């Protein structure tokens, strides 16, 4: 149970970081007139990768939780 709490906390933490990065990028776009640089594109790819990984981890954790609750897998 403790490891599941740690995993969920990690997923929440990564989601919060991704959200704050998006807000910072949105503010930066306003400053430079909306131009998109190569660095911003790379950040977007990294953010999408992190979001996908977080969704996969959350799905696996939910499946394990469902198995524990129902009592059979």
From Swiss-Prot:
Residues spanning the signal sequence: 1-22
Q: Which GO terms describe its biological process?
A: defense response
UniProt subcellular location: Secreted
Instruction: Extract the Pfam families matched here.
Output: Antimicrobial_2, FSAP_sig_propep
Please describe the organ and tissue distribution of this protein's expression.
Expressed by the skin glands.
Q: Please explain the role this protein plays, according to its UniProt record.
A: Antimicrobial peptide.
Similarity remark:
Belongs to the frog skin active peptide (FSAP) family. Brevinin subfamily.
List the protein's name. Pelophylaxin-1
């Amino acid at each position: 149970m403790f490891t599941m709490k740690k995993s969920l906390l990690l997923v929440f933490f990564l989601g919060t970081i991704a959200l704050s990065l998006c807000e910072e990028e949105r503010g930066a776009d306003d400053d430079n007139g909306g131009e998109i640089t190569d660095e911003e594109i790379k950040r977007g790819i990294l953010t999408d990768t992190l979001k996908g990984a977080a969704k996969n981890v959350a799905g696996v954790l939910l499946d394990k939780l469902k198995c524990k609750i129902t009592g059979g897998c």
